C-alpha cells in the first residue's frame, strides 16, 4: 500500500528539483537524473520515504503526540494554514520567531497576550479606549495574530515538526534538533537531508507539490488522532515496475513555475 500513486506525484510536479547549478551533493542518492538543466527526483524513493513519514506521524498522533506545521515561504503559507487547521495541528506560516522552541516560556507569554487582546476586542473593550491607544493595541494584535495565531492552543513543545523547505526554515530545524524533536520535511535537491529525521525528497517550491504532500501528513495526523483511516491508496500494480523514464515524458508542468 502506497500513500500516493506515482501518477499523483508526477502530476503535482513533485519530481522537479532545482537547477543543476544549485544542489546539495548529499541529495545525490535521491536524484534520478537531469532534464534541461533541472534535477529530476527519484519518485520511487520519494514514495517509499513518504510512506515512512506518514506511518511515523500517524503513530505519534495515536500516542497522543502533537505536531507543528512550519512553512513561511509564499508558496507554502496558505497550504500550511489550511491543512494544519483541518487536522487540528499547530502552525507557523509567516515568520519563525527566534527561540520559539528553545525559549518557549517567553513565547507562551506573547501567545497569552494575543489571547488577552482578542478577548478585549471581542468584548468591545477597545471601544472605550482613546483612539490612539486603540490604534496601538490593534497594531500589536495584528502582529501577534500574524506570527502566533497558529500557536494559540500550544501549551507545550510539539512532539513532531513538519517542515516545508528546511533550507529556508533553518532556524526551526536548528531548534528542533537542539531539543531532539523529530522532524519531517519536504527536502528538495538543494537541501541537507542529514538535518532531517524523516525526509520526503520532493519539489518544495511548487504549490501543487506542497499541497499534495502536506495534505497527506495532515491525513496521517488525523488518522492517528481519530482512528479513522483515510485509506492509503494502493499504488498501481506497475508502480513498482514503472520505468522512471516516464518522468522525462511529462510535459504538462511549467518548469519555470517550479524553480
From Swiss-Prot:
Keywords in alphabetical order: Ribonucleoprotein, Ribosomal protein
Gene Ontology, cellular component aspect: cytosolic small ribosomal subunit
Annotated segments matching region Disordered: 228-259
Record has Glycoprotein as a keyword: no
A GO MF label: structural constituent of ribosome
PROSITE patterns, sorted: RIBOSOMAL_S2_1
Source organism, top-level taxon: Bacteria
InterPro entries to which the protein is assigned, alphabetical: Ribosomal_uS2 (IPR001865), Ribosomal_uS2_bac/mit/plastid (IPR005706), Ribosomal_uS2_CS (IPR018130), Ribosomal_uS2_flav_dom_sf (IPR023591)
Keyword Ribosomal protein: yes
GO biological process terms, semicolon-separated: translation
Cysteines paired by S-S bonds: none
Composition-biased stretches (Acidic residues): 233-259
PANTHER family tied to this protein: 30S RIBOSOMAL PROTEIN S2 PROKARYOTIC AND ORGANELLAR, SMALL RIBOSOMAL SUBUNIT PROTEIN US2M
Family membership: Belongs to the universal ribosomal protein uS2 family.
UniProt protein name: Small ribosomal subunit protein uS2
Source organism per UniProt: Thermosipho africanus (strain TCF52B)
Amino acid at each position: 500500500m502506497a500513500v500516493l500513486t506515482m501518477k499523483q506525484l508526477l502530476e503535482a510536479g513533485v519530481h522537479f528539483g532545482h537547477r543543476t547549478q544549485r544542489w546539495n551533493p548529499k541529495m545525490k542518492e535521491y536524484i534520478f537524473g537531469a532534464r534541461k538543466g533541472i534535477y529530476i527526483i527519484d519518485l520511487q524513493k520519494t514514495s517509499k520515504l513518504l510512506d515512512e513519514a506518514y506511518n511515523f506521524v500517524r503513530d505519534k498522533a495515536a500516542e497522543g503526540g502533537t505536531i507543528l506545521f512550519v512553512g513561511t515561504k509564499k508558496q507554502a503559507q496558505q497550504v500550511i494554514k489550511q491543512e494544519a487547521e483541518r487536522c487540528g495541528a499547530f502552525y507557523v506560516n509567516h515568520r519563525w520567531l527566534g527561540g520559539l522552541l528553545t525559549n518557549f516560556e517567553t513565547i507562551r507569554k506573547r501567545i497569552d497576550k494575543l489571547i488577552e487582546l482578542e478577548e478585549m476586542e471581542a468584548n468591545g473593550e477597545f471601544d472605550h479606549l482613546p483612539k490612539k491607544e486603540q490604534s496601538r493595541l490593534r497594531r500589536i494584535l495584528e502582529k501577534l495574530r500574524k506570527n502566533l495565531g497558529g500557536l494559540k492552543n500550544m501549551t507545550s513543545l510539539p512532539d513532531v515538526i513538519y517542515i516545508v523547505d528546511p533550507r529556508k526554515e533553518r532556524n526551526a530545524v536548528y531548534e528542533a534538533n537542539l531539543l531532539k524533536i523529530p522532524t519531517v520535511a519536504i527536502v528538495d535537491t538543494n537541501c541537507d537531508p542529514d538535518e532531517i529525521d524523516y525526509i520526503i525528497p520532493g519539489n518544495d517550491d511548487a504549490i501543487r507539490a506542497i499541497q499534495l504532500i502536506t495534505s497527506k501528513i495532515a491525513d496521517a495526523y488525523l488518522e492517528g488522532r481519530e482512528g479513522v483511516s483515510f485509506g492509503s491508496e494502493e499504488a498501481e500494480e506497475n508502480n513498482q515496475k514503472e520505468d522512471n523514464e516516464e518522468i522525462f515524458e511529462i510535459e504538462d508542468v511549467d518548469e519555470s513555475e517550479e524553480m
